[in-house]
Design a protein with these regions (language model features):
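N-terminal glycine-/charge-rich "phosphate-binding" loop or analogous flexible N-terminal tail
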Residues: 1-39, 43, 157, 161, ...
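Oxidoreductase and adenylate-handling cofactor-binding alpha/beta cores
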Residues: 96-115, 154-158, 287-300
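Rossmann-like dinucleotide-binding domain for NAD(H)/NADP(H)
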Residues: 84-85, 217-316
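Phosphate-coordination loops involved in phosphoryl transfer and adenosine-cofactor binding
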Residues: 59, 133-136, 208, 217
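Phosphate/diphosphate ligand-binding glycine-rich loop within oxidoreductases
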Residues: 38-114, 129
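Glycine-rich NAD(P)-binding loop of Rossmann-like domains
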Residues: 113-148, 175
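NAD(P)-binding Rossmann-fold cofactor-contacting core
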Residues: 155-173
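Rossmann-like adenosine-cofactor binding region
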Residues: 36, 48-52, 167-261
Length: 316
């Protein structure tokens, strides 16, 4: 039996140490094919659809080294008896820290001021830096990472508003925020932070109409998924000055191609999808994904299986 790793950055020695006790061999291969393939380890750029079962009919599990899972046909694979497993909480601290860094950067004008000095300008500033304490942070989504962001932002004196269809007001309040409708959040926030998962319901959630509700001096920070925001509508808002700026850790195509329009947008900070990253979180992401696949191969319940496969049935 084989486990195929389609990400050439995956540390195979660690994957083998975790999975080979299950009686499998672990190999890097961009081709998923063979009756002996029982599991696949993938990454956000490695899409896995139901058609994989045409070439690997005995597939039991797909593990991704990411929290996001929009690259996996979760429901379709579950219907065919395949577990899809993601990793959770492996980079919560890193994403919170990076998002806070971007919030500080846009409000305090860190990148703008650096650019002025390099251009030979010292004073005056084209835009005044703003205080972080007392600013309104609007958080779109309420999960483990956004919970950490709310706690951290409220601790430094930000007024945190949260929009979520699923959150309870008491839970948001316990984290340090206030639950409000999305439209109210957009109209009030100094900074809107996108922190929700990408699903069919959230795809394009922040569209042209939503961006138009933002204050003209507001910033948008996205460390979640690019497709939650209408990319072209955001660009138009930045180019026309309808909002003050943006900080983006995610783009529609990654790595960014040379013709990526965001590269020329004014008042925009762009990051290489790095909010999740540290040496520690990198190791945890690979190990946790392999551990969950190992659980499936041992006949156990994975910790982070997203949809119970039909053929597995309910737990006893």
């Amino acid at each position: 039996m084989r486990v195929v790793v389609i990400d050439d950055t995956w540390p195979l020695d660690r994957a083998r140490a975790i999975l080979e006790p299950c009686g499998v061999t672990v190999e890097f291969n961009t081709e998923i094919a063979g009756d002996d393939v029982v599991a696949v380890l993938t990454y956000p750029g490695g899409k896995i659809g139901v058609d994989v079962l045409d070439a690997a009919p005995n597939l039991k599990a797909v593990g991704t080294c990411s929290t996001g899972f929009d690259h996996l046909a979760v429901d379709g694979l579950a219907e065919r008896g395949v577990w899809c497993c993601r990793v959770t909480h492996f980079c919560d601290v890193e994403v919170v820290d990076h998002t806070m860094a971007l919030i500080y950067a846009v409000l305090r004008g860190v990148v703008m001021l650096d650019g002025l000095v390099r251009e030979g300008t010292w004073w005056p500033y084209p835009r005044a830096p703003r205080p972080v304490r007392g600013s309104i942070l609007g958080v779109v989504g309420f999960g483990a990472i956004s919970h950490g962001l709310i706690t951290t932002a409220s601790a430094v004196g930000m007024d945190v508003r949260v929009a979520s269809e699923h959150a309870a007001a008491g839970d948001v309040a316990a984290a340090g925020g206030t639950l409000v409708p999305l439209d109210d959040l957009l109209g009030a926030a100094d900074v809107v932070a996108i922190m929700t998962s990408l699903t069919d319901r959230t795809r394009g959630l922040i569209d042209a109409a939503a961006i138009a509700k933002m204050r003209p001096d507001a910033y948008l920070v996205n460390t979640a998924r690019a497709a939650i925001v209408d990319h072209l509508a955001l660009g138009r808002a930045l180019e026309t000055g309808a909002i003050a700026g943006a900080a983006l850790d995610v783009l529609p195509v990654e790595p960014a191609p040379a013709d990526e329009p965001a590269l020329t947008w004014p008042n925009t900070i762009i990051q290489p999808h790095a909010a999740w990253y540290s040496a520690e979180s990198d190791r945890r992401s690979f190990d946790d994904a392999a551990e969950d696949v190992a659980r499936v191969l041992r006949g156990e319940e994975p910790l982070n299986g997203m949809t119970r496969p039909a053929e597995v049935g309910p737990l006893a």
